[in-house]
Amino acid sequence: MSDLRRIVIKVGSSSLNHPEGGLDDQAIQRIAGVIAGIRQLGVECVLVSSGAVAAGVGKLGLKTKPKDMAGKQAVAAVGQGVLIEKYALALEARGLVCAQVLLSRLDLAEASRYRNAQNTLEQLLRYQVIPIINENDTVAVEELCFGDNDRLSALVAGLVHGDLLVILTDVDGLYSANPKLNPQAELIEEVEDLTQVMHIAGGAGSSMGTGGMVTKLKAAEITTRFGMGMFLLHSKRMEEIIELIQGERPLGTYFFPAAHRIMGKKRWIAYGGLSEGSIFIDEGAVKALLKGKSLLASGITGIDGVWERKELVRINNPDGIEVARGLVELSSEELEKVRGKHSEEMLATIPNLEGEEVVHRDNMTLMIE
């Protein structure tokens, strides 16, 4: 990994919490020290940091974080200022400048906003600024949240074309079973095939965090399909990120990049955009898609949802499992009229189409291999 150009680090609230409440200032200082060390190696760094809610809980003297949405958002609004101020002071002491970037789900769901976020982050990195990214908890709608910063960090890694994502956590990596419940659990140091380990992840997070191992494996799916490696590292050994960059392999779990990676617009189609509905297809159409073909009307058996032309839809097999997603050339109303029909009949029914494809392969990303 000695040829890394850009690294994304995600630190969760469990790594930032002080045992007595609020933020652990020492943890902030350690993170700043790691970032400074990374920059001294000539590697650019983006930080995705939780902690706003925990910081707000400490600032307001609360014993636990609120459970309702309004309470969480109010506490996050208080805490985000505390969090970024601590980071700014710690980095400034090391000669570095940081920038706060708060992203909502819609910032990555809409293609134009996705590009704007991408351009802003690229400019910050050209200025040699450390972007510190968090979800914009204060205005997020529950149905349109990232859910956790593990997923956000993976999307950010794709957004900035990173080379490696490091997720700091409160365990040494991925285990064969939950190490907190099973003392015989063994650390899995390398993962080449995610499908072989998805079943072993425990879903529980900490009291202040929202992400368990399931969310980290989802982040690994996104990151590795983007063509990047991902490393799970215990936050108590965060300084070993420097060793990782220098080509050594510290204790933890490394997820290898997928053999078939997705690039450019197809990254946004797969994981950035929000789908408006579903198209159901027969087995023949599934086989065609897996061979790199476009989706034609003849293979479509049903639809669910309402959408207009050029919007994003899921494409499901007969069992309802998503096999692809893409930008559809027909509205849901138009597609209902022509589903199951051959191309000639479709074009005769809806004459103002540019081609016979319902979803062109250039505007489609496979979600299974």
Swiss-Prot record:
The listed locations are:
Cytoplasm
Please write the reaction equations for the catalytic activity of this protein.
L-glutamate + ATP = L-glutamyl 5-phosphate + ADP
Which of this chain's residues are annotated to bind substrate? S50, D137, N149
Record-annotated residues binding ATP? K10, T169, D170, T210, G211, G212, M213, V214, T215, K216
Cite the annotated pathway. Answer: Amino-acid biosynthesis; L-proline biosynthesis; L-glutamate 5-semialdehyde from L-glutamate: step 1/2
Gene Ontology cellular-component annotations: cytosol
Entry keyword set: Amino-acid biosynthesis, ATP-binding, Cytoplasm, Kinase, Nucleotide-binding, Proline biosynthesis, Transferase
- Extract the SMART domains matched here: PUA (SM00359)
Primary localization? cytoplasm
- Give the PUA domain ranges: 276-349
Q: What's an example Gene Ontology biological process for this entry? A: L-proline biosynthetic process
Q: Which PROSITE patterns match?
A: PUA
| EC number(s) recorded for this UniProt protein | 2.7.2.11
Q: Which family does it belong to?
A: Belongs to the glutamate 5-kinase family.
Q: What does this chain do?
A: Catalyzes the transfer of a phosphate group to glutamate to form L-glutamate 5-phosphate.
Protein name according to UniProt: Glutamate 5-kinase
Q: Which organism is it from?
A: Desulfitobacterium hafniense (strain Y51)
